[in-house]
């Protein structure tokens, strides 16, 4: 092996005392490597990753930027620009949905994550779509998914109040159902969860909860002990069910957590689809997705991806380098699809290994997750085919950080530190130049006990260069960003970076 990129997902470097699990954890291995190797920090948010100013980074954007080696203008920014220019309602896919319901007399069903977290969606985009419906003179209904993960665990009450105010202002856009993202945005094939959100949208039999108003849905949930992420799917009095003649616009711009619900609503069932016996019979309506959720979906896409060319994976393949991508299922798409610039198919010489994430409701119940098995996969590969380049993701600091459980987050960080002690020596012994970094922070700020912080952070992330024993320890320059990682790997491999990669090697 020649080079290895080890992504410590959610491992940020804070400078405060707000329950920083990274600082509080006992991390002798990472500390030793940071001291022994060349150490620097990278920025991961805002314009440095193609997002609006002041917007925290996320795993999708982070891995996309890492693989592209340049700043890629994200869908979030493109949607914001369209709204600012007054072009959203005239977007071909969105205007097509509006035309459809204008012709049929049906309802435009807008659905998505209602928060200002900006990781999967932004509530302002949902507000703007309601305004589009009002401007066209058609009825709209909103199916609101509450956040509590990229935002405050109890911020949903305010977000839904804002949404209800938008509906009042425009005379349409009443909330028809409310579901926590735990149900509506599952990405781990927990189809029974997704089906519950589907049932609330279609008003199928078996919806357990009903509320007089959207805000009541979350306040009732709080009384049951469930915060925004876990609001059980609830129908709202007087809300419209998805029916024949209607149309759907799914406002989430991030794909991974929108795919399962889209499959159920658009009746997309490939031959090898396994949904644990879940059966649905949705009305045959157009389902517009804000971005391309899956290249196999036959859905109109409002903002198709502008896929970057000459990504890290493409360049490695062009130079006949074999590459191994390893992650547990929670982050598998990130080290494959997103790192490859939105490409579903592996490059020549690219091997992908997925390790199942633990089957637990939330990862504070098992902070180590599947990190040991991820490491074992690489050790087995080193003893076998020994690929030229490795990209690996340890999910723990991010996934456990999202629970807001400080003690569990400490355990998660320490679990990753233990794995680094097994992994890095083996990589160096195999001749690999290892790099440790992160895509964004999370476990570095868990807020306070009274006000847990479960979202990503704006803090910089580490970049540690660990050459093999025979290699030189070049210094890591200041001013680095995620776009500089791919050029750095190409540098140690002796490959010229493509001109489209505007990042530069971090090694001085």
UniProtKB/Swiss-Prot annotation:
Q: Which cofactor does it need?
A: Mn(2+)
Cellular-component GO terms for this entry: cytoplasm
Give the cofactor binding note: Binds 2 manganese ions per subunit.
Q: In which pathway does it act?
A: Carbohydrate degradation; glycolysis; pyruvate from D-glyceraldehyde 3-phosphate: step 3/5
Top EC class per UniProt?
isomerase
Q: Gene3D superfamilies from the xrefs?
A: Alkaline Phosphatase, subunit A, BPG-independent phosphoglycerate mutase, domain B
The name on file for this protein is 2,3-bisphosphoglycerate-independent phosphoglycerate mutase
